[in-house]
């Protein structure tokens, strides 16, 4: 038996085809697979207000993930992800390019089908608007959820078009998808409303307070509700993630973001996404690498609960 250095996966092939995130198997019928988590790319950026290009984010995250796949286990975890969690990558959602409504409908339908088959989802954007149809699907399955939201922007603005990557978390509470009083926004450092019920841990707090103190507040706020976890890559300082459409200085380091993510392990996380990676503005793939690493940490969180 030949063992590839990429993810300790058996590989006797003489030819190579496109591969999934972290070289997980591609499965275009994930609903009938034995997977526990399904990775879905959403190459959509029509709701962007700044620089476009995040539609190429899913491909960039997958491509750079081969730099992570050679490790049999990700530091500092003490187990192999592949041994604890069944994951497939089902590729990208297919929709009519240029039709935001069609994307929203197709993504929600796909998510509802995945969840109905007993699986859970990790999605790659694409701009942050994709989280809204995902929340609609998850709320149908899990009921009203708490939101744990890493971002430079609160995305609670009431203005904007029907499809806008700055209004999802205005619409989501109004549609009854999430409970803002049990939701936390982390790393915010732009103008935002203060009377909408969300707990906002702005960038100054996140950078100045201890990780343990922050995690205690997050856990107390969320309680035992089902949690949707969304990570906009512009939560990170542009020094660590320049490749995004709306960068804002003064953000989180990758070290602090990873420590906060690892501390979310006790939460009942039912869905996750990583959004707003725009490789056209990246340098040496560091933004894509940050996105891929954050996605991998999210999967390790889920795998750790099975040990």
Curated annotation (Swiss-Prot):
Catalyzes the formation of putrescine from agmatine. Belongs to the arginase family. Agmatinase subfamily. This is Agmatinase. The keyword Transmembrane helix does not apply. The keyword Nuclease does not apply. It is an enzyme of class 3 (hydrolase). Its cofactor is Mn(2+). It comes from Photorhabdus laumondii subsp. laumondii (strain DSM 15139 / CIP 105565 / TT01). PANTHER family: ARGINASE/AGMATINASE, GUANIDINO ACID HYDROLASE, MITOCHONDRIAL. Keywords: Hydrolase, Manganese, Metal-binding, Polyamine biosynthesis, Putrescine biosynthesis, Spermidine biosynthesis. Disulfide bonds: none annotated. Pathway: Amine and polyamine biosynthesis; putrescine biosynthesis via agmatine pathway; putrescine from agmatine: step 1/1. It catalyses: agmatine + H2O = urea + putrescine. Mn(2+) binds at residues 128, 151, 153, 155, 232, 234. Its EC number is 3.5.3.11. Pfam families: Arginase. One of its GO terms (molecular function) is agmatinase activity. GO terms for biological process: putrescine biosynthetic process from arginine, via agmatine; spermidine biosynthetic process.
């Amino acid at each position: 038996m030949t063992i590839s250095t990429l993810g300790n996966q058996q590989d006797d092939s003489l030819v190579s085809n496109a591969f999934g995130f972290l070289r997980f198997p591609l499965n275009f019928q994930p609903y009938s697979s034995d997977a526990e988590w399904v990775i879905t790319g959403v190459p959509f950026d029509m709701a962007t207000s700044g620089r476009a290009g995040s539609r190429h984010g899913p491909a960039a995250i997958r491509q750079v993930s081969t730099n992570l796949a050679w490790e049999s286990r990700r530091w500092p975890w003490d187990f192999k992800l592949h041994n604890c969690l069944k994951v497939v990558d089902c590729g990208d959602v297919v929709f009519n390019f240029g039709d935001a409504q069609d994307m929203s409908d197709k993504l929600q339908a796909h998510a509802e089908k995945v969840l109905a088959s007993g699986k859970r989802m990790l999605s790659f954007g694409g701009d942050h608007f994709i989280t809204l149809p995902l929340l609609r699907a998850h709320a149908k399955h899990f009921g009203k959820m708490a939101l744990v939201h890493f971002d430079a922007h609160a995305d609670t603005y009431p203005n904007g078009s029907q499809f806008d990557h700055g209004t999802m978390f205005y619409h989501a509470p109004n549609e009854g998808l999430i409970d803002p009083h049990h939701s936390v926004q982390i790393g915010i450092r732009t103008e935002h409303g203060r009377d909408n019920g969300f707990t906002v841990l702005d960038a100054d707090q996140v950078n100045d307070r201890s990780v343990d103190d922050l995690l205690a507040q997050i856990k107390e706020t969320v309680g035992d509700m089902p949690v949707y976890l969304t990570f906009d890559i512009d939560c990170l300082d542009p020094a660590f993630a320049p490749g995004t459409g709306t960068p804002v200085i003064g953000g989180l380091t990758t070290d602090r973001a990873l420590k906060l993510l690892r501390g979310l392990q006790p939460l009942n996380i039912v869905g996750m996404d990583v959004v707003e990676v725009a490789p056209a503005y990246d340098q040496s793939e560091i933004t894509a690498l940050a996105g891929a690493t954050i996605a991998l940490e999210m999967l390790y969180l889920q795998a750790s609960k099975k040990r």
